[in-house]
Amino acid sequence: MKNVLYIIDDHNMVRNGLKSYLESHTEWKVIKNFDNSRDCLSFLEKLPAEDEIFPEILIVDVQLMGENGFQLVREISKNFPQIKCVMYSMYDTAGFILQAKDSGAKAYISKIAKEEELVHCLELVQREQTYLEDHMIQTQNKISSIVTMLSKQEKNIFEAILQGKSNQQICDELFLSNRTVENYTSRLYSKISVKDREELIKKYSK
């Protein structure tokens, strides 16, 4: 069986709506739906790669019942490199686009994109290509030169700020003290020529 994909999204209506559209208008077969990453990983670990229902593509929401969809994509990329991941989200700011790329996703598409765009995205990814919507490409190009001059932790903090995360959330996620985050943030501001968080978001979020 070809054209097999799974959908991982914690909203039942989204999963069912995507499945209905894709199976009615394309040759894709949505064999499995999951509302969390644990069940998806557990299922894949028990499924032989040669099985006819082994997926070519996963459509993954960024946020899954409090979980991080990016972490799922990282684990898929590491443990199942033959599976291609498409991030599907309401968020289309620079921080999310950067993190999707870093996690190993082949595409990032907004949930408000037209159905035809999603189909086009899947076609490209199936052919080993990548996909971003036009306005996302502009965003990525805008920040690509910035990212290259940042350290790993500065980049992590840059992405987190663009996602609207507080300093405490950044501390918790990166396992850093508040003072350490403040130091990295200060160096980040200096490198990208902004004076504070508000200016960074205004300058680089779109």
Q: Where are the regions a protein language model picked out?
A:
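The feature encodes the CheY-like receiver
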Residues: V14, M65
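Short amphipathic alpha-helix used as the core "switch/output" element in two-component signaling
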Residues: F70-Q82
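Active-site residues of response regulator receiver
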Residues: D61-V62, S89, K111
